[in-house]
Amino acid sequence: MMSVFGSPATYVQGKNVLFDSASYITRLGRKVLLLAGSTAYKIAGQKYVDYLKDNDVDVEYVPFNGESSVSEIDRVTEIGKEFGADLVIGLGGGKALDSAKAIADNLRVKVAILPTLASTDAPCSRLSVLYTDEGTFSAYRFYAQNPDLVLVDTKIIANAPVRMLTSGIADALATNVEAQAVARGAGSTMLGAKQTMVGNAIASKCEETLFAYGTQAVASVDNHAASKALEKIVEANTLMSGVGFESGGLAAAHAIHNGLTALNGPIHDLTHGEKVAFGTLTQLYLEGADQERFDKFLKFDLELGLPTTFADLQIPDVSDEELMQVGQLSTAPNDTMVQMPFTVEASDVVEAMKGVDAYSRYYQAHHVNK
């Protein structure tokens, strides 16, 4: 099998770049379908529409309904056809951006991805995560190429909720853990190929950056400051993690995230990254990570306020039957658990999740605030 490396055609990051982006946008198209949720539109979208129109770009704004489902993608695709869009812009969080990619693919036009949060590694990838209308994981949708443009305005990121940045750090923390598992098993990446050395190296650098600058960046956002530490973490969350997971591969951490979508209740109020955080700890447990490495991740998660127990996941009374549903969905043949370097059964997932919950409670009782 060949090795493949993928990345967006152009990546732009910095303070105030959103309103200095006309030259990048007009290279791609002048009839823009802008997909954005209500919050993103209020924060930046309305002003951005005016900015584009001032630069001779015709814009059709379509409100995003909040779920990257087939029905939502088809709905907006029809609007794009009627408008005659030659460029789709996704503005907002991960699900809006994933939907924008799918809509552009349906329309066979270019796509520009403009995240208003550094909360996931979705922006740079050539795939979308699809869910049912009710929010249960459905499938991955793959494309022939990565986005034509990813543009990240760190001034906007600095004014977003701190929780969104920590969620992005959590998502990015899985990148190297999963990439190294794929490497050990000589598995396949999300590009359907073997890892390149570059993809693996980026995943490793991503983890190094997160541990080095993560807490500084969180403090910066808490004070709405676009610091150098924040710039580094935004790049790690968005570019390094996005390229690293795609060219490095996914394994148990994201499969367990997908498994958790089988549960009902307030767990659905958690972000993608918050669920991935628990998935990463579970993968480390499955691998038999030594105590020093496991504790490094656990301590960092606790510092950032990320979920490390069932109570944190809003499932304090979860039953073995419900955990088995998580295990079964996460080990489905179409998910990334198959890239682990050893066979993982649903029962193994249940045992590992219970082990993480128990160890975190023990660790906190004996180490936190002692």
What are these regions (language model features)?
Residues 3-5, 25-27, 81-82, 104, ...:
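Solvent-exposed alpha-helices and their adjacent loops that cap or buttress functional pockets
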Residues 80-103, 107-117:
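A short, small-residue-rich loop immediately preceding and capping a beta-strand
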